[in-house]
Amino acid sequence: MRSDFAEFRELVALPGESFNPIEAAFLIAMDEYPKLSAARCGRLMAEMKNEAEEHMRSLQGRSAKRAKGPEVIAQVEHFNKLFFETWGFHGNNDEYYDPRNSFLNDVIDRRTGIPISLTLLYVDIARGGAAIEVIPVGMPGHFLAGFNAREDLYIDVFGQGAFLTLPECAKRAESIIPELIFEPGHMYRVGPRVIVARMLRNLINIYINEENFPKALHS
């Protein structure tokens, strides 16, 4: 990255909770799309969060609020209807290695992406708009959303919001990496800086596989 590099570096240098992975992801996209403005990026997120809040209010008959226990699952199911059915977000199985799957503006415009970009978007809107306490979770070969309060259930955003138990995650991981001997420790909460670093690595690997070395170096 060169364009917007100074702003990106300043953002990465921010301490702890001040670092915003959504903002960083949009800066990565702005490097690819110089005409993409920060104002448009912010507007896109604000509009979706507002719609998510209204959606939860209309379904629950009250303002969106933080839920606990079984009510969280019901809230996730309600939010999933908006995210996957109304908005039409889905995993891009057909063009998994298309670089556009890693640019957040493209993910929003095209309604498709890869596990990490879809989950980043899902978690941010769920937390900021639908008031659902979900977190990003890494596992071997895949990326999920999970819950702060429990480690036995996960959300496969790439898989249209399907709930996965820990044994199902183990089966999925071992199907992706046959030599893997799965352990519960393979499921881990992913910090915001790690998410952005993984998104950049994905782009670099895609460009290397395409033998687009100038792009790989630029990223």
Q: Which residues does each PLM region occupy?
A:
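A structural boundary/capping signal
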Residues: 1-219
